[in-house]
């Protein structure tokens, strides 16, 4: 899209259309803060759904991709890359499947799906509104809240108190999304869409939630012909004790199918999850799991049961009706064949951590007179498998920085000691048995009146910790930085301290 105007000027008789546009990357239900920082890669192996995870060769953001064509009458339109995630090409990682989709491999929409819906649908006939992210973070943590709507006006409320109102113009790149930032506390976010006359036409809510208490099953249909060609897609999600969806649930779920049906497969849409599709148990990812049910060639009932340690089971009854035209037995057997690798996890009973709550009794401001503070961590649910917590000090992009050190007090408490002025984050993460970070929580600190941190010129410096740049600088892999594909980019590092035998000039 960024090349269209020049190409049209050079070749006014050419037909232009976008065969592969966007290429933004996102993981369903994963949010890397803050929104203002571009974050292509992170410790959890996921891509942020806030809209701040982009590759250096793709569109700079979803807004640019969606709006550009509206102002280019010589363009026939575009095909987003991609509609669905697909197995392979897992830019920017080396995991199972891609992150380009607006819908994940399990068929669950990501937030980006609702963004394009807000641009490409008519509020007069199909009004819509969507809030992101979910609402469960550290107390006081500043959270970027985004609202997508096709309406001309949106308002955000917290616990029925108005946070703000915004008028939107869906032809303007910088005025297509309603954005707010507010400190987290438990409660209810409500977004309301209004038409030109000020009438409410749509609303969406996000509730704070607790640990998973029960499972819920819902099917795309409750009855199918018993022809061996139909599949039933059953969504499994977790609810807390008050009935609210647990949007970051990671519970391991076992699925059994009885009667005139068989379990064809399970998928949660998580690119970092290598467990087989054709097994009988998987973990929820961002609170969801899909079970694919294949009816037999006989009419009757199918009973689907989902169970998880410590949770109430969920049961769903489906029906199949007699049908004259049936598929071949060979095709039906191919559909239901089990992956032998699934036996390795079939009886797993682990209870993974779904979130980590970090807190600090003192204000998160460190000074020369009080350069340290103690941070505590609480993992959820309380009965999750015991595992070590990994701690580190990073900048907003997740790069380890030398501004402070950490001292372990016990399994859930750590002391931070600041060495220099600056803003930084303490990150706490877990692996949930995978050998690599699967989720983290972070707490922001500010250090002042301590002094400037000089870089060591006699050791390596992380490339993305530059202090000044001219030209285009984009996201790189592994918390790195990439120079632009066109023009000249210069990057400056400092300040350095060369010691008594070097020169600082």
Give the ranges of each region predicted by the language model:
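Substrate-binding/catalytic cleft of secreted carbohydrate-active enzymes
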Residues: 1-139, 143
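Catalytic cores of secreted or luminal carbohydrate-active enzymes
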Residues: 79-214, 244-246, 252, 449-475
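Proline/serine/threonine-rich low-complexity linkers at boundaries of modular beta-sandwich domains
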Residues: 116-128, 206-214, 336-356, 482-484
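Extracellular ectodomain segments of secreted/surface proteins
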Residues: 117-140, 349-368, 490-499
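Structural beta-strand segments of beta-rich domains
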Residues: 141-145, 230-234, 371-375, 489, ...
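Extracytoplasmic soluble-region selector
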Residues: 164, 181, 193-195, 202-205, ...
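Low-complexity, acidic Ser/Thr/Pro/Gly-rich terminal tails and inter-domain linkers that flank the onset
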Residues: 209-225
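Short beta-strands within extracellular/lumenal beta-sheet-rich domains
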Residues: 475-504
């Amino acid at each position: 899209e960024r090349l269209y105007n020049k190409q049209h000027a050079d070749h006014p008789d050419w037909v232009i259309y976008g065969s592969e546009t966007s290429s933004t990357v996102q993981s369903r239900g994963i949010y890397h803060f803050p929104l203002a920082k571009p974050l292509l890669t992170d410790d959890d192996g996921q891509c942020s759904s806030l809209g701040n995870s982009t590759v250096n060769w793709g569109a700079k953001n979803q807004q640019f991709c969606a709006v550009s064509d509206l102002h280019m009458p010589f363009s026939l339109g575009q095909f987003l890359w991609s509609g669905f995630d697909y197995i392979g090409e897992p830019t920017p990682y080396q995991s199972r499947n891609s992150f380009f989709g607006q819908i994940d491999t399990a068929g669950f929409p990501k937030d980006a799906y609702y963004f394009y819906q807000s641009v490409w649908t008519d509020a007069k006939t199909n009004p819509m509104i969507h809030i992101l992210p979910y609402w469960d973070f550290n107390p006081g943590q500043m959270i970027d809240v985004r609202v997508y709507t096709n309406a001309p006006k949106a308002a955000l409320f917290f616990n029925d108190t108005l946070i703000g109102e915004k008028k939107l113009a869906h032809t303007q790149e910088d005025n297509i999304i309603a954005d707010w930032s507010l400190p987290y506390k438990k409660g209810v976010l409500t977004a309301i869409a209004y038409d030109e006359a000020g009438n409410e036409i749509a609303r969406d809510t996000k509730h704070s939630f607790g640990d998973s208490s029960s499972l819920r099953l819902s099917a795309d249909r409750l009855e199918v012909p018993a022809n061996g060609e139909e599949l039933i897609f059953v969504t499994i999600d977790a609810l807390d004790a008050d009935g609210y969806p647990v949007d970051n649930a990671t519970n391991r779920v076992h699925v059994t199918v009885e009667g005139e049906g068989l379990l064809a497969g399970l998928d949660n849409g998580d690119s970092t999850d290598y467990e087989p599709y054709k097994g009988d148990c998987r973990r929820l990812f961002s609170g969801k799991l899909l079970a694919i049910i294949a009816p037999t060639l006989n009419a009757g009932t199918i009973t689907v049961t989902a169970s998880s340690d410590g949770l109430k089971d969920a049961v769903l009854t489906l029906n199949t009706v007699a049908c004259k035209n049936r598929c071949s037995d060979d095709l039906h057997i191919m559909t239901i064949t089990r992956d032998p690798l699934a036996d390795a996890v079939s009886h797993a009973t682990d209870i993974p951590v779904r979130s980590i709550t970090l807190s600090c009794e003192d204000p998160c401001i460190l000074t020369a007179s009080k350069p340290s503070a103690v941070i505590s961590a609480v993992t959820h649910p309380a009965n999750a498998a015991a595992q070590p917590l990994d701690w580190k000090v990073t900048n907003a992009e997740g790069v380890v920085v030398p501004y402070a050190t950490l001292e372990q007090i016990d399994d859930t408490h750590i002391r931070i000691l600041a060495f220099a002025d600056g803003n930084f984050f303490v990150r706490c993460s877990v692996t949930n048995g995978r050998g690599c970070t699967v989720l983290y929580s972070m707490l922001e600190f500010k250090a002042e009146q301590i002094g400037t941190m000089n870089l060591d010129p006699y050791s390596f410096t992380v490339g993305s910790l530059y202090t000044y740049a001219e030209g285009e600088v984009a996201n790189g892999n592994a918390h790195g930085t990439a120079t632009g594909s066109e023009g000249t980019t210069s990057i400056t590092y400092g300040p350095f301290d060369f010691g008594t035998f070097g020169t600082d000039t």
